[in-house]
Design a protein with these regions (language model features):
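Helical scaffold of the NTase/Pol beta-like nucleotidyltransferase catalytic core
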Residues: 1-32
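Conserved nucleotidyltransferase catalytic core and NTase-mimicking acidic/glycine-rich helix/loop elements
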Residues: 153-306
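Short secondary-structure boundary/capping segments within folded domains
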Residues: 19-23, 40-45, 96-97
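Conserved NTP/Mg2+-binding pocket subregion across the NTase superfamily
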Residues: 2-6, 71-188, 193-194, 294, ...
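Short alpha-helical segments and helix-capping/turn motifs at coil-helix boundaries
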Residues: 14-16, 35-37, 90-93
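Short, solvent-exposed loop/turn segments at secondary-structure junctions
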Residues: 37-38, 58, 112-114, 211
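Catalytic metal-binding acidic patch
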Residues: 33-68, 72
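Short aromatic-enriched loop/helix-cap "lid" or pocket-rim segments at secondary-structure transitions
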Residues: 43-45, 118-121, 220
Length: 306
């Protein structure tokens, strides 16, 4: 089946899900979560449906997976293993289903026992606090449940300790990237530069910088997908310039541009929060990386590079 140009409306799909839940006795409650339940989120034709199914026993749904076919022809599916929910210790699982007609549903299955505890908790889990809509509740399980605040995943100001750790960890990766580039080892260099340095350390710094302009009130989005809309355009342009193709020389330039951008943004954050940016660490690591780049193969450095 090809992706359909006549995609059913959101209300049609929700009606379909509710009817399916009503027809299956094991489904005691059903909740819609994430972007389609958050009035502050933007949605488009590719926005998926995040659905929580509350059932007496999750194992039959895990072991016999034919129920997924009730919603259409499955193109591809990913299954999480069954694992205990952090903070509760009760088993749950989730799956991600892309249907051939374009519909995408992410199901999370919670046993009734787990959901009762969540519904009665003083604080909602982030996945519910970001937004939820009760689609079906056969046993009044959601009675008295807290309303979502839609504030989950909004970054908060880092402590000085957290800020300094992000800066130190970012610069600790730079010599490794340089070593891989010097050795013409593209894959580990790109992994460390484009994932480790950028997503683990530069992205949080960019999110903090974004929040400075928005008074710590807006979510950055999963993997920073909201940054382009909310960062100053010149900072976003600098970020784009940190991405390179496969040429080693271009990746050396990308590394230096990443260092420059991080320095700029981290200094902005430090100034706003009255923290001290470790400029000495920055300068020493940058100089060391430059020295690594210009080593001749087989050359001897003042200190061995392993």
């Amino acid at each position: 089946m090809a992706m359909s140009n006549n995609t059913p409306s959101t209300q049609d799909i929700l009606h379909w899900l509710i009817q399916w839940g009503e027809d299956h006795d094991a489904v005691r409650a059903m909740l819609l979560t994430s972007s389609k339940a958050n009035p502050n989120a933007s949605v488009d034709i590719f926005s998926d449906y995040d659905v929580v199914l509350v059932v007496p026993d999750i194992h039959p749904f895990y072991e016999d997976r034919t129920w997924l076919l009730d919603f259409g022809e499955v193109l591809v599916v990913y299954w999480d293993p069954i694992y205990p929910m952090p903070g509760y210790g009760i088993e749950q699982f989730a799956n991600v289903i892309q249907y051939a007609d374009g519909l995408k549903i992410d199901f999370t299955l919670w046993p009734v026992e787990l959901f009762r505890q969540i519904a009665q908790a003083p604080v909602l889990p982030a996945d519910l606090d970001i937004g939820y809509t009760v689609l079906l509740d056969k046993d009044h399980l959601t009675d008295g449940m807290r309303a979502p605040t839609h504030t989950a995943y909004i970054p908060t100001p880092p402590t000085n300790e957290t800020y300094q750790k992000v800066v130190e960890d970012f610069f600790s990766d730079a010599p490794y990237v340089a070593k891989c580039l010097w050795r013409d080892e593209l894959l580990p260099a790109k992994w460390c530069l484009d994932y480790d340095m950028k997503h683990l350390f530069l992205r949080p710094m960019l999110e903090w910088r974004m929040e400075i302009d928005h008074r710590w009130s807006v979510p950055a989005g999963n993997l920073g997908k909201g940054l382009k809309k909310r960062l100053p355009p010149e900072i976003w342009a600098q970020l784009e310039d940190t991405y390179a193709g496969a040429a080693i020389a271009d990746n050396w330039e990308a590394l230096y541009r990443t260092l420059t951008l991080f320095r700029r943004v981290a200094m902005d954050v430090a100034d706003h929060l009255s923290y001290a940016y470790p400029l000495d660490l920055d300068q020493r690591v940058t100089a060391y990386v430059q020295e690594m780049q210009h080593l001749e193969p087989g050359g001897v450095n003042r200190r061995p590079i392993r």
